[in-house]
């Protein structure tokens, strides 16, 4: 690649609930790209994005978007049409990973344990049918723990009005345990991190606010849990056809010695508090090296 082929557009923002976080990721990635010798330009995702890309004429796109549009295959499809190589996963892997029902069916089919889904009743309130234990309600297609509600036994069911009318919801059994995560780079697991949060779970604030969570790298868990987490993360990455980097999230019920995969995130956070850059650094890969590598292997769907 010559110096004339090193212009990169870092896509960020948009209009979803995760737009602000995306801009922080973009700042981190754009700076890293410049340090690696790329001519980096941050581009806001809006109705004028095609004109902006036409003006810039990038040789690569670094996808720093989070949530719907940027993570569900939509932007990936646009970049395929424009024939601009982009980082991270393609259309099918992105769309499938974002859909919590489709992805879990696939994970289960290859021997990955996932929390049981519950039949959901929606009216004024949202609650599972014929189930009285603790449960979780969450959007079917969203990330960064946006819109997640935990309902403990004896608590009132959440009102449907808490979510937008067009938001598809799912419910699952609430499983307590230790929160683990594994980043996968080029199909190989980096390491296991344990996440310690002051609240009930690893929510939006815990993920992105400084001091919102504490991380233990590598996680102090039995070797067999480390091996299983890494193995399942690599298996999920492969079966969905992911590219570049992704991050798989788990709950380990230590009392029952059961591991559950919650999801695989094809657009993991790339901020100062994010898990994937932290795991890469633990493995000797700097933020600059990680971003540069993702740009070097950027591609469109074949």
Model-derived features: positions:
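ATP-binding N-terminal substructure of ATP-dependent carboxylate-amine bond-forming enzymes
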Residues: 1-92, 96-98, 102, 109, ...
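C-terminal active-site "lid" helix and adjoining low-complexity regulatory extension at the edge
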Residues: 258-302
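Short beta-strand-to-turn element immediately C-terminal to the catalytic PLP-Schiff-base lysine
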Residues: 118-120, 148-154, 184-186, 253, ...
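A long amphipathic alpha-helix within ATP-dependent nucleotide-binding catalytic cores
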Residues: 164-168, 210-255, 289, 294-298
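Phosphate-binding site of ATP-dependent enzymes
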Residues: 153-231, 259-260
């Amino acid at each position: 690649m010559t110096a004339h082929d090193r212009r990169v557009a870092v896509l960020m923002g948009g209009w979803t609930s995760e737009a602000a976080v995306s801009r922080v990721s973009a700042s981190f990635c754009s700076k890293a790209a410049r340090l690696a010798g790329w001519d980096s330009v941050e581009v806001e995702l809006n109705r004028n994005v095609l004109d902006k890309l036409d003006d810039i004429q990038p040789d690569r796109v670094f996808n720093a978007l989070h949530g719907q549009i940027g993570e569900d295959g939509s932007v990936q499809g646009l970049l395929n049409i424009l024939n601009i190589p982009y980082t991270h996963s393609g259309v099918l892997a992105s769309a499938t990973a974002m859909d919590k029902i489709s992805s879990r069916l696939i994970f289960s089919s290859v021997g990955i344990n996932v929390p049981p889904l519950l039949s959901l009743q929606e009216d004024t309130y949202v609650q599972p049918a014929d189930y009285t234990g603790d449960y979780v309600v969450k959007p079917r297609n969203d990330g960064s723990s946006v819109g997640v509600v935990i309902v403990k036994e004896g608590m009132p069911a959440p009102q449907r009005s808490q979510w937008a009318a067009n938001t598809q919801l799912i419910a699952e059994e609430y499983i307590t345990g230790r929160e683990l995560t594994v980043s996968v780079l080029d199909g190989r697991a980096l390491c296991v991190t344990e996440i310690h949060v002051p609240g009930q779970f690893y929510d939006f604030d815990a993920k992105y606010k400084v001091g919102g969570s504490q991380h233990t790298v590598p996680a102090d868990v039995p070797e067999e849990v480390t091996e299983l987490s890494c193995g399942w993360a690599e298996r999920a990455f492969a079966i969905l056809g992911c590219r570049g980097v992704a991050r798989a999230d788990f709950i380990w019920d230590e009392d029952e010695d059961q591991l559950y995969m919650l999801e695989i995130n094809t657009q993991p956070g790339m901020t100062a508090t994010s898990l994937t850059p932290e795991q890469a650094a633990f493995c000797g890969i700097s933020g600059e090296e990680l971003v540069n590598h993702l740009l070097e292997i950027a591609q469109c769907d074949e």
